[in-house]
Amino acid sequence: MTIGPFVLYADFGVKSFVTRDKEIREMLKKRMNEGVECAKRVGCKWALVVPGRFDEGLEWDYQTANVIDNLKMCAEICEPSGLVLVLEPLNAWTNHPGLFLTKIPQAYQICRAVGSPSCKIVNDIYHQQITEGNLIPNIDMAWSEIAAFHLGDNPGRKEPTTGEINYKNIFRHIKKKGYEGVLCMEHGRSKRGKEGEKAVIEAYRACDS
């Protein structure tokens, strides 16, 4: 059994990573050090980071540069222990308006700029279907920086086979590419009770055949 990414930082209401504010940077350092110790206790390799809200009053490229600088600082704290920060782009249309990080190409650009084995991407297929689609080509383009996947169908964010995403093809594709990481079931169930639990199991069996 492998523990998937735990949430280390995901304050949706704060302009955090996009700033140069010294107090924010000290807060992030503290969070990273706490995260490293938590990961050691539970034996976890990945820690999820959402870089917070974007700043309406600051040019976008400056925000990107600030995010990169802050993540470099965070990655330096995590590297000695082997903890990997995984950035999660989230959709702005259905669930999380106002956030800085929304797309896989954007996360890829940031990870490449940070240039650390402790800064990677968790590709949430549900969110990215809403934000950009083009799922398999984006997986291929960002492959070197993807450390984990979150799963859920769209619309509805229930188990695979309940929406429009072809998980069977996605699973085949990442298996062919040699993926051996975690697949995190971050979704609800289309049915309640025991029948709903059976439906989830059957859905994954169907997609993994």
Tell where the protein language model's regions lie, with residue ranges.
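Generic alpha-helical scaffold signal
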Residues: 11, 22, 26-29, 164, ...
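Histidine-acidic metal/acid-base catalytic patches
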Residues: 43, 101-123, 127-209
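Active-site-proximal loop/turn and secondary-structure-junction residues that shape catalytic pockets
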Residues: 7-12, 51-55, 89-93, 125-127, ...
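Residue-level detector of anion-binding/catalytic polar loops
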Residues: 1-2, 45, 84, 180
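Conserved beta-strand positions in the central sheet of alpha/beta enzyme cores
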Residues: 4-7, 48, 86, 147-150, ...
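Active-site acidic/histidine proton-transfer and metal-coordination neighborhood
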Residues: 15-120, 130
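Short hydrophobic interaction/assembly module
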Residues: 1-17
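Generic short alpha-helical segment signal, independent of protein family or function
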Residues: 1-4, 37, 205
